[in-house]
Each structure stands twice: as C-alpha cells, then as structure tokens.
Amino acid sequence: MIILVPLLFAVSFFYSTVGLAGGSSYIAILVLVGVNLFTIPPVSLALNIVVASIALFNYLRAGHLSLRISIPLLISVPFAFIGGSTILPEKTLIIIFVIALFSASAMLLLSGNQIKNRQEKIRKLNLSLSRLSLITLPLGAILGTVSGLVGIGGGIWLSPILILTGVANPKTAAASASLFILTNSISGLFAHSITQEVDFALILPLAFVVLLGGFLGSRLGAFKLSHEKLIFIIGIIVAVAGINLATRLFN
C-alpha cells in the first residue's frame, strides 16, 4: 500500500491546481491496489473534503471566489445526499459520464481563444444573480445527484461547464468547483456513513498525503498559473478523469 503515497500526492497536487480534488482518480487508484469496492466511495469523498478545503482556502485568499456563481450551486448539497444514499447500477451512467468528460476535454483543448471571447462577452453583460441562477440552480441539482451516486465531488464536470458556457473564467471556475466539491463531498460522505461503515483507519494516513499535495497544488494554481495554462491543465485533467472513470467499467 506504500505505492498509494506518491500516487495520491501527485493526483492531489495536479487536480488542486485547478480547484479540483481528484475523486475520480482516487477511485481508479484504490481499485487498482485492491481496496474493497464498497469501501472506495466514502474514502474518495473523505479525501475530496481534505483537498477541496485547502484549495478553497487558497483560491479564496487570492480573491477568485464569486458568490454570485457559487451560492446557487449549493442546491447540490441535498441532491448529493440523495445520490449518496441511492443504490443504482452504475455502468450506463459511467458510459455517459466518460463521453461527457472526453467531449468537454476536447472542447477545452481545441477552443481556448473562443472560450476567452465568450467569457469577455458574458462579463460585459454582467448577468444578474437571478439570470445566473437559471444556469447554476439546475446544474447544481443534476451534478449534486450524480456526484453523490458515483462517489466523487462533481467539480470535474462543473469546471468545464462554467468555462465553456462563458459563465466563469478558469480561476473563478476553480474556486467555485472547490466549494462545490467540498459541500457535495461532505453531504455524500454523511449519506454513505448512514448506509455503511466508513474505514477511517484507511482514510486518516491518506488524508495527510493529499493535504500536502492539495496545499502546494492549489497555491500554484491560485497565485501563479495564467488563465490559458489553467484551461489547458483542466482539459488534460478532464481527459484523465474520463480514462479513470472508464476503468470502472472493467471492475
């Protein structure tokens, strides 16, 4: 199990540079090292909580969190609980998610300049909270349910959607994603703790590893990296997440 240390550190570092926590990759890694499948979702959610907390702290300090965008997304919390307490066949959902992730990744990597132009137009429109809520409320509800069901925070879908629709620039999207992941993961973990036993003996040592990786990565993303580099990194990470989720089809 010592192999978990460098793998989880790397995942938490790279994902946190863009405000993500790495839940989909934690799942893939834990599957590969032979952790019991029923144990994995709450462990992944717990690690998400650690990384998303420190990522949110760094992006908040850097002034990138937009409450106009983030507050309506918090409707996801009760839906994450519903998803986390629901037992459904996952394979069909995973196929849809993998297609969505690869599509988002391709759009991010191939249309960087168009994204920047779209974001500038949205910024000039200065949409009211009520109009933004028409996008963020249903988005939060859908992604909250999905994230609780699958056992990840949901930011891996949220970030590309916010960027591709022009609602947020990459750093604002990263800050919103970290808050979204944190609240959903807490809700999902609570739901899992009601329906099954949570392996805190496994979680605690791994939490220290991802705490360090998450702190260093999110600090780099919040204060150092440019928007263009963040779009590229998000595109790559979303593609990797798609590959990792696809591995669940064979386990």
Residue ranges and their predicted role:
Residues 1-16, 27-33, 37, 57-145, ...:
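Juxtamembrane transmembrane-helix boundary motif
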Residues 18-26, 151-159:
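Transmembrane helix boundary and interhelical junction motifs in multipass membrane proteins
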Residues 21-22, 53, 79, 186, ...:
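Residue positions within transmembrane alpha-helices of multi-pass solute transporters
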Residues 36-46, 167-178:
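Membrane-interface alpha-helices at helix entry/exit sites of multi-pass transporters
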Residues 43-58:
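Transmembrane alpha-helices of multi-pass small-molecule transport proteins
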Residues 44-48, 177-181, 203-207:
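Short hydrophobic/aromatic, small-residue-rich stretches within specific transmembrane helices
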